[in-house]
């Protein structure tokens, strides 16, 4: 067997061994051609009138190493997905005109050939073959990437001034100000180290230009296709993938940051106000996979007097069908139709002997319940409900399709080869969520952790709403969160979804967290940046796995600094990764961190932060409502209120929590003092009640203190929170 796919597996950042690189070469560029022919002794490319012998290669090992996010169970799968045995490659002469090519694989006296492929050189031209709509005089240097196959991309330049700052582009982990950086906007599951790699689960083709002269503005490329950005000197170059029409639709918003954000959200939608309970502490651990474990963890919260408002149960179904409690007894619905609550019974010796009673008990204690989801359907089971559901998805037209009409199978490393429901249309959204309705209506589940959503790879995938993959893939996580929000609303509940992936339009759909991260100080800093950039784009309800979820248990200092900061973020949650149930445990519960580190300060200080968080819930609820009404972020970068103060850019991790509180997380180990910049105004140190002048102020930061300052005008109302 010999395989060559010009686009490869369409990993956005890596090359697969059967790929053409580049897929769309420029005139005068050579092309690297790859094939996979595991049993071949010799492979030859028929390239026009030339015959090019291929050499055996080591299947993108460098890409696999670069993309593995570090230690963790997903890193192995990630690296493995890019490898292949029997990889061959050859570099062609520079491409000057369209060329047809094919491959011949030889083994002994036998030969096998591929079909013919064609590649055409492309050139950038300033000829008026397309149109940039909108932008006016801000748009310069318009060019189009053209080949004999059509117009593929457009690019243009936006003028910047000295001192202008670029903030936005969705959730970004590497820097608040993206001036001088190169980035793109494509939904991608980067397992850890997102800031190092410059990738994100939640991109948006939108940014603020915070003007050094006070004349700010912003822009939105109205597309769901991939875009690229590069700023050098006083210009921002924007490159846009095109569809059938050579048109770029660009919106420009003039005004201060809040005005710019309002213009953007008026187009794409804004957050829906969620109930106050979402601001309480969330507790989670992937290995809490039985009723006994979940109950025990919540009992310990109670016994140690550590308030908790929600528990996220990830392994309730053990990642098989994600619809039925593990060990439940039931009859398979062979047509893939939804079960009802009365269709199930639960074994006394099973993992979840009485999940309804467990949820009722948690509710009686004031603890909400969130269940994990992923928008994939496993296919490795030949019998049972999972197999019936997979067959129904394909048979009844609910699957995302390949260009040839077959069902798309996940090309990524997590749930490989799984089917993907086509959530672009209401028909499939209803079919997919109806299987979970009994969880909401009978079990009284309060929300869903809508994990994943980054699994669509392929420019030519086919969606039922008429889009192809190049246009529909980035929108997939938006449809996904919407589907579960609609399910919850239909049952009379708030649309509490908890997602990591998203795109333009995600602002209207629930809560987000920063995704997979190690327990390191660098990840802590990256997560703060992620929260601020997401907020700049209209994400209101946002959090992270405090102190990271992956790798060894964090030391006490990192854990407590992260908990202190998280008490002053929109969502406060701890979580731990799957670790094959090995010992020692890697739970991030405060008592386990205390036991692991031997530091007896952890539990009392964490209790202090969680109790303080309870007192902040009314303030956070009030401020979230104000955010939605005014478009001034809840976790607010300082430039929204102090855009004309150049000093704020020297303090990129500081932020306002609502209108009244300024937060400066302690982000380095071993700190005994910490310096905060207080913009113009009158401020109160919330821990001492002392009035503090604006400017640079340094205070002691023992582990129980994160620098927080309140505007003096609201101190009388907020003082009881900190008493």
UniProtKB/Swiss-Prot annotation:
UniProt-listed Enzyme Commission number(s): 3.2.1.204
UniProt-recorded name of the protein: 1,3-alpha-isomaltosidase
Domain of life: Bacteria
Major localisation: cytoplasm
InterPro entries xrefs: AIMA-like_N (IPR048488), Gal_mutarotase_sf_dom (IPR011013), Glyco_hydro_31_C (IPR048395), Glyco_hydro_31_N_dom (IPR025887), Glyco_hydro_31_TIM (IPR000322), Glyco_hydro_b (IPR013780), Glycoside_hydrolase_SF (IPR017853), Glycosyl_Hydrolase_31 (IPR051816)
Cellular compartment(s): Cytoplasm
GO-annotated cellular components: cytoplasm
